[in-house]
Amino acid sequence: MKKNYIFYTLFFLFSFSINSQVVLGDGDILNSNVPIEAYYGYSYSQTIYKSSQINASGSITGVSYTATPSTTLTTSGQWVVYVGLTEKETFESTSDWIPISELSQVYAATAEAPTTISEEGVVTITFDAPFEYDGSSNLVIAVEENQDGYDSSSDDFYSTEADQIASIYYYSD
């Protein structure tokens, strides 16, 4: 039986009168294929975060994902990140995509400035422009990785198991 995973080992960087972070999940599962699948040449994922899990409103200025310390992004560094608001709480199926036209591109890496990972295995994405989150809608974050090449099959990110489909993904060579 296919397990459903939500990619919760993620920090939302909110801007209020003081800076704050929202941490979701405990990150106890590896290889859920989100936010990217580094072992393939192309990957795309979408994850829904419920407003009750975020419990804040304001400007989102970035996200962070936690990977295994040995993970590299040598040939998986050209990430494009999209964010949007949705009334959906879960995906109905693994093909129930939220149209990209309903999302805003907030980050795009290039060959000259690829997405990088720290020695501790943290990928921090600082958005090109803040995304205004209303605090009442659910949030969807989509991550596309389209750099030619393949990293190791052991390059994995942490996630948390969920009862319903909160993340969907696609990958190919």
Describe the role of every protein-language-model region:
Residues 4-16:
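Sec-dependent N-terminal signal peptides
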Residues 30-39, 72, 100-110:
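Surface-exposed, low-complexity/disordered Ser/Thr/Gly/Pro/Asn-rich loops and linkers
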Residues 22-30, 54-57, 75-80:
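N-terminal/edge-of-domain interface segments
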Residues 165-173:
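PGST-rich, cysteine-poor low-complexity/disordered linker and tail segments that act as flexible spacers
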